[in-house]
Amino acid sequence: GQPCSARWRSEWGAPPPARVTIADDSMTADAAHRLACEGTALLWRGDFQNARQLLNAMARRADRHPPKPGTSPAESFHFHRQTQSRRARILGMLLVPLEEDYEIPLRRAPDLRLACTEAYGPGEGQALVSLRELLGLVGAHEWRKNGVVVPALGDRIHPHYGVFSPIRSEYVDLVADAPLPSNALAFDIGTGTGVLAAVLARRGVSHIVATDQDPRALACARENLARLELTDRV
C-alpha cells in the first residue's frame, strides 16, 4: 500500500489516533475491541451496515466492565465518568472515510451529505471520522428536520447539531409557569435553541435579549424564532 492522508474530524476535540490499521468485514468483534483498547484505530473498508453491527458488538464488550464502586458518592461518580470516557474512546476508534462532498465510499452506505454539511459546513477535502460521531449526526439531523415538541410552547423547536435539545420539559415548564416581575424586559443568557426566549415572548414579555457564545446556537435560535414569528420581540 501507498501512504495517504486525510483530514481528521472530531466535533468534540478528540485527538487523531496515533495508529491506524485497515479493517473490513473479515474482522471479528473480539479483534476489533482488542485493537481499540490498545489504541489502534480501525479504518473501515467493508460494508457500512456491517460496520454498524461491529460497533454495537464492540459496545457490548465495553459494557462488560462496569465502573468499580467507590467509597464515597464523589469517588463513585469519578469512577463512572472514567468508565464512560474509556468507553467513548474505545468506540471512537472505528473510523469511516468521507469524500470531499461527504459521500461515504463504502458498500450500502447511506447518503449523509446533508447531515454532515449541517454539522461541519462545506467539505474541505477527504476526511476520516469516527462511525460513532457520524451516527450522532444522523440523530441530530432528524431532530433538526422533525423538531422536538415543547408542550409549554404549544409548538416545535428544531435543534441544530451541537445545540442542547429541549427534550426535558422541567426547566421549560418552570419558565412557563413562574410569576414574572415585569413584562417589559427579559434576558435569556445561553439561549441555545431559543426555546426559553420563545416561551417568554409567548407569555407576553415585550422585549427579550437572547445571547449565546456559540455561533451555531445563535443561528439555531434565529431560525426557530423566525419560524415562530417572534423576531419582533427577541
Q: What kind of region is each of these model predictions?
A:
Residues 1-2, 6, 10-13, 17-148:
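N-terminal auxiliary segments of SAM/dcSAM-dependent transferases
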Residues 1-19, 50, 86, 159, ...:
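Proteins with a high burden of low-complexity, intrinsically disordered sequence enriched in S/T/G/P/A and R
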Residues 15-17, 66, 151, 159, ...:
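Proline-rich intrinsically disordered, low-complexity coils
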Residues 95, 143, 157, 223-227:
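Hydrophobic transmembrane alpha-helix bundles
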Residues 132-180:
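Class I SAM-dependent transferase core
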Residues 168-234:
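Conserved SAM/SAH cofactor-binding pocket of Class I
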